[in-house]
Amino acid sequence: MKNLNKNTKIIVGLSGGVDSSVTALLLLKQGYQVEALFMKNWEEDDKGRYCSAKQDLSDAQNITNKLSIKLHTINFSVDYWNDVFTHFLKEYKKGRTPNPDILCNQKIKFGAFLKHAISLGADKIATGHYARIAKKNGTYQLKTGLDNNKDQSYFLHLLSQYQLSKSLFPLGETNKIDVRNIATENGFVTAKKKDSTGICFIGERKFSEFLATYLPKQQGNIVGEQGQFIKHHQGLAFYTIGQRKGLEIGGGFGKSGKPWFVADKCIERNELVVVQGDHTLLYYQTLNTSKPYWINTPPTLPMTCNAKIRYRQQSQSCMISQDNNKQLKIIFKQPQRAITPGQSIVFYDNETCLGGAIIEYR
């Protein structure tokens, strides 16, 4: 941002939360021409019990009124359904566990949103993500946010050079505590607003309850590591690798009182394999991927780097190689717990996010 002209028009993705509120304030204080754009990505149910779009819009209006900046609104519900949600459902039907937030960033927040912002005259867009962008040798790099607990580069690893060139992350060099303090000092209604968790279209519902409205139940067996029948499940889509909560396996099974976890899904037999405690079947040292994406020039393989198989995981050392189909094979230095097909593995070189791929199998 240091090299930007003060006449630069920046449109902030204002969600009605504290992070985007402070983002708008910081840019305004730096003298830029700031406007805001609130986007709606999901049509609520008639009772409005789950989605908070109305309240979020009200909070966004409150912030823009306080800052005396213009607020635009746009409905991307159709785009979200076509580009994100349909893929989400297809993956769950296959028994996989997708991450819609990553696709939403690529297709909606830095896709449809960016395009619309430019049509409104924006030179750049800004969001409240905790990440950083650097330019080196004529190309843009995605860097981790300085607040390790809030770093969101994992969700942004599919951004293109063009998307990075048009984006700003003012919160990348700050931390959440300071952001809330700034919001409080400026009397923002969002100062103490709870951070959004989970997926926007699910809201406060149980995930299985939401999924059941779109996917038919398909009863199968829950079995132990030796194939012994334990109970029935209502569909593999309602479970994910490593899951503990919701299995509801009583005390009449197993040799100990240790909790049960999902270790595997057998799609062909429609079986859910469960184990007790910190079982070895929960750990794998290798995985294979599809759809590799590199933010900058693809590296020479094989190579050693760090990787994360889920958000907020501590980076893990690994070796990346390429198979005959040009897909990536990952070997970790240490076995990893609950490697989950459909999720993303994201690669790092210290604080630089290199890119990522989709986990296919272990």
Swiss-Prot record:
Q: What class of enzyme is it?
A: transferase
Kindly give the InterPro entries that the UniProt entry links to this protein.
Answer: MnmA-like, MnmA-like_C, MnmA-like_central, MnmA-like_central_sf, Rossmann-like_a/b/a_fold
Keyword annotations for this protein, in alphabetical order, are: ATP-binding, Cytoplasm, Disulfide bond, Nucleotide-binding, RNA-binding, Transferase, tRNA processing, tRNA-binding
An annotated GO BP: tRNA wobble position uridine thiolation
UniProt site positions, description: Interaction with tRNA:
129, 343
> Looking at the record, which segments are called Interaction with tRNA?
150-152, 310-311
List the catalytic residues.
Answer: 104, 200
Location of this chain's protein in the cell: Cytoplasm
Extract the GO molecular function terms from the UniProt entry. ATP binding; tRNA binding; tRNA-uridine 2-sulfurtransferase activity
Q: Which residues bind ATP?
A: 13-20, 39, 128
Q: Name one GO cellular component term.
A: cytoplasm
The reaction(s) catalysed by this protein are: S-sulfanyl-L-cysteinyl-[protein] + uridine(34) in tRNA + AH2 + ATP = 2-thiouridine(34) in tRNA + L-cysteinyl-[protein] + A + AMP + diphosphate + H(+)
Q: Which NCBIfam families match?
A: PRK00143.1 (NF001138), trmU (TIGR00420)
Similarity-based family: Belongs to the MnmA/TRMU family.
Protein name (Swiss-Prot/TrEMBL): tRNA-specific 2-thiouridylase MnmA
**Where does this protein come from, organism-wise?**
Vesicomyosocius okutanii subsp. Calyptogena okutanii (strain HA)
Gene name, Swiss-Prot/TrEMBL: mnmA
